[in-house]
From Swiss-Prot:
This is DNA replication and repair protein RecF. One of its GO terms (cellular component) is cytoplasm. GO terms for biological process: DNA replication; DNA synthesis involved in DNA repair; double-strand break repair; SOS response. The keyword RNA-binding does not apply. The RecF protein is involved in DNA metabolism; it is required for DNA replication and normal SOS inducibility. RecF binds preferentially to single-stranded, linear DNA. It also seems to bind ATP. It comes from Symbiobacterium thermophilum (strain DSM 24528 / JCM 14929 / IAM 14863 / T). One of its GO terms (molecular function) is ATP binding. It is found in: Cytoplasm. The lineage of its organism: Bacteria, Bacillati, Bacillota, Clostridia, Eubacteriales.
Length: 375
């Protein structure tokens, strides 16, 4: 798949903009605070319905304007898809797919798939478990609408159950219904996440060995109340484990008035050279592990959806040493549409540009195709 055209109106610092991209490599370069990251944010917004930088959609609306527009033409193996999102300061998001209004924004997810690697991702290992869960959820939601449906239902259920736990008198009948739904829906999420981590681990390990020049191994493991030490994660086993945990922690949940059982408590373990990278990894080891994970994500999603997602690299060249930088760019293989932002083309250390590349100079909300990038 690739993004052939991006159109923006009143999006961040872009008043009105239309860009035609290469199906291969697209480099967005220019000084800081000119709008490079805003372009990647717009692509991410069209892929997921959300910004990767803010939880408030109105933050993306240009100052002094009431509503933003983001529109894209996405070329898939099955044909071209036209996506359109509008969002206002006082109005909810509105979605059209191929000109037809959709009631649910979730219908957008999967039409355009992306893998984003930004400097913030370098905190994935040392940050809280919520970031690692979010990584899995975004990946799997783009692959499967069924997973996204289960995730949304589960999040609503946990919120409702937490509200019930805060009541002075708990409706036991309603709690029993919530418990049953939590076990069923939660087990679906645990099984799919555990399977994804099981498949990601050897792929990430392969990339990690190359990046670390065979000095260290990387291993991933999904850590869940629903998965035992033996790693068993079939649906029935996970259900039974969640049921047991609910019974064991029932009094503690009521004392603390919060749901303590379920996939919203899970984590992903990273081990580098046999040591827990979340606790002991150096900054260099963190960078290598996260880079290996992102390359594994790209490969895994390509296998799952039958074509590569877009790769968005936001100013990561400045965060990587020359060896990792060179490996990352060489790993951007043919057939993957890539978007790279940087302040200076020299930062990329590219000796020879591929034939299907385009260079765009970004300056104060304008984007100009560089003559060196005509292809």
């Amino acid at each position: 798949m690739y993004l052939s055209t991006l159109q923006l109106g009143a999006f961040r610092n872009y008043d009105s903009l239309t860009i035609h991209f290469s199906p291969g490599l697209n480099v967005l370069y220019g000084d800081n605070a000119q709008g490079k990251t805003n372009l990647l944010e717009a692509i991410h917004f069209l892929a997921t319905g959300r910004s990767h930088r803010t939880s408030r959609d109105p933050d993306m609306v240009q100052e002094g304007r009431e509503e933003l527009l983001a529109r894209a033409a996405v070329v898939r193996r099955t044909g071209t898809i036209e996506l359109e999102l509008r969002c206002g300061l006082q109005t909810r998001k509105q979605l059209k797919i191929n000109g037809i209004a959709e009631r649910k924004i979730a219908r957008l997810v999967g039409s355009l798939a992306v893998v984003l690697f930004s400097p913030d991702d370098l905190q994935l290992l040392k940050g809280p478990p919520s970031g690692r869960r979010r990584f899995l959820d975004l990946e799997l939601s783009q692959i499967s609408q069924t997973y996204l449906h289960h995730l949304m239902a589960y999040n609503r259920l946990v919120a409702q159950r937490n509200t019930l736990l805060k009541q002075p008198v708990i409706d036991e009948g309603l709690m029993a219904v919530y418990d049953e739904q939590l076990v069923e829906t939660g087990a679906q999420l645990v099984v799919r996440r555990a399977e994804a981590v099981r498949r990601l681990s050897p792929i990430a390990s392969r990339y990690h060995r190359m990046l670390a020049e065979d000095r260290e191994d990387l291993e991933l493991a999904y850590q869940s109340q629903g998965v035992g030490d033996d790693g068993a994660a079939d649906l029935e086993t996970v259900r039974r484990r969640l049921e047991r945990e609910l019974a064991r922690l029932r009094s503690e949940e009521r004392r603390r008035q919060v749901t303590l059982v379920g996939p919203h408590r899970d984590d992903v373990g990273f081990w580098v050279a046999g040591r827990d990278a979340r606790l002991y990894a150096s900054q260099g080891q963190q960078r290598t592990a996260v880079l290996a994970l992102k390359l594994a994500e790209l490969e895994f999603m390509s296998e799952e959806i039958g074509e590569p997602p877009l790769l968005l690299l936001d100013d990561v060249a400045s965060e990587l040493d020359p060896h990792r930088r060179h490996y990352l760019l060489s790993a951007v293989r043919e057939g993957v549409q890539s978007f790279i932002t940087c302040t200076d083309l020299e930062d990329l250390m590219v000796r020879e540009w591929p034939a299907d590349h385009r260079l765009f100079r970004v300056r104060a909300g304008t984007v100009v195709l560089d003559d060196r990038g005509l292809s």
